[in-house]
Amino acid sequence: MANESFGIVVHGGAGVLSNLSTEQQQIIEKKVSETLISAYKILENGGSSLDVVEFAVSEFEDSPLFNAGRGSVYTSEEVQEMDASIMSGLDRSAGAVASVRKIKNPIRLARKVFEKTEHILLVGDGAESFARSIGEPIVDPIYFYSEKNLKRLRKAKSKVVQNQLIQDKIGTVGAVALDKSGNISAATSTGGMTNKMPGRIGDTPIIGSGTWAQNKICGVSSTGHGEFFIKFQVAKEVCTRIEYLNQSLEESSTDIIQELKQIGASGGLIAIDKDANISTPFNTDGMIRGSITNKSELNFAIY
């Protein structure tokens, strides 16, 4: 039986976005809107939410606009280490990769982890060896080179202010979708935090923290100060409050983001529930976000 509601919501990260020029905002809006329209058409034609979130996130990974894939920021040793995760609410299948340096689309490899292995999370060299064994695209690290991100790293090193490093973590990408079969899926991908220690892993590849999907309840993708999002299992907590406290999607997600603010944690999240209601709360200067459902027209916002 077809689900009456369906749709998708995406984000391009939360953080200090007030320095984006009008031209930069327009370029980002164009990319997000084009991706949303293409993703929505897949849903409209009966495509699966899992395929849709993988598609949307891989589109953002291929763009230098975001802190994921090609646009990933640098560690303190001037290398890029990427994390990603994806989850299906149908049976809670989930896959993730962390600290990969040569994977063109970490989100695609994350999906392969649960489809082709008995594991959920593969890290570093092991993840890249797995990618080679299944023919997943491996690229030279030069593919990810970014003069802009190197300048950000050197600026961060000169400041040596932890709060600044956290605020600079913008651009993480994510997508959450509900399809016509009622299946909810979520996906998140990031380059992490500028000037992070090599090997540091945040919330993005941690199921329940950066990504969560649960049919008949909701799906969530988060962005922000990963250590706090891990401690409070933010993505799953949104769905838990809906399930056990009978909160609405908006109440649950907004309350959690405000609670994080009270303890000094910055960030935001995107979420969709079983009725295609959407919530996009954040406690930062801005969060790049957009959505489209069969009940609402395409929407894009930063602030």
For the regions a protein language model found, what residue spans apply to each?
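Alpha/propeptide regions of enzymes that mature by internal proteolysis
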Residues: 1-303
